[in-house]
Every structure is written in structure tokens, then in C-alpha cells.
Amino acid sequence: MGVLNIELHEPEIPANTGNIGRTCVATGTRLHLIEPLGFRLNEKAIKRAGMDYWEHLDVTRYLDYEDFLKKNPGAKIYYATTKAPQTYTDVKYEDDCFIMFGKESAGIPEDILVKNQETCVRIPMIGDIRSLNLSNSVAIVLYEALRQHNFAHMNLEGHLRNYDWK
């Protein structure tokens, strides 16, 4: 299996990006940040949330969405949005695909979504909930993509510190 990619479009909250970075390190996933960012990458909040994993993160920054597209020609991109007509479990995530998430206050711009309806996905929710937390949403969709690939390259068995399972 190739490496999956998480793409954050103009993230605003450093703690969310730090948590997402930690999830990316734990899963062998690349993180792509599309500017402008609502924070500096050296802020304490991002380091605290990412803990000591941030230095191991494979992260790339882009000036804007057009810069991202130019540097990743032909990329297969899934757009995670509350506005999508299908759920995140309805699609098959290809090797090396990108899963894009929008900024916390507004999501992915609709002019991007309308051009990519067939690859827009949503996490089902009840009622009139606006959205889930960004880092939680990334984890939900990313782990579905990893599950579809049988968690290739990941540790599937845990170990007790002071006991044996047998």
C-alpha cells in the first residue's frame, strides 16, 4: 500500500493541527497544509498537541490550493464536508490518495466542492449539528481508509507491559 495523505485547507486552530499531526505520525500518513494558516507552526499549542511526535511528521506546506494542485498533478482527492451527498464509507480510498478537510470555521470552499461532487464525503450525524471537531473527523475518515487497506504496515497486536496475554 502507498502512503495516504491528509490535506488541511487553511486550518485555524493549532491544537487541532497538532493532534492531526500526531495521528499522521502514528499511521504513517503525510500531512499537507494549505495556507494561510491561522497560526505559526512553531506555536506552543501545536507542539503540545503533537507532543514529541511533531519532529517525525512528514509535512508539506503550500501557498494556496492552486499551488497544491500544481505540485500534485493528477492527485486523487476526497473532500470531507458536511455538505456531501455520500458518506465516507461509500467510497474506496486508493493508495496515495488525499483526503482534504476544510478550516474549522467554514469548511472547504463551495467552489472547490461543486467541481468535485463525486469525491465529496461526509460523516453522518444526527440533528442540526454543524460539524464534528476537525481532528476527530480526520481520525474517523483516515482510519476507514486504513481499514480498507487492512491496516497495512501497522501494528495489529498490542502488548501488555507487565503481563502476557497468554
Language model feature labels by segment:
Residues 1-166:
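Post-transcriptional modification and biogenesis factors for structured RNAs
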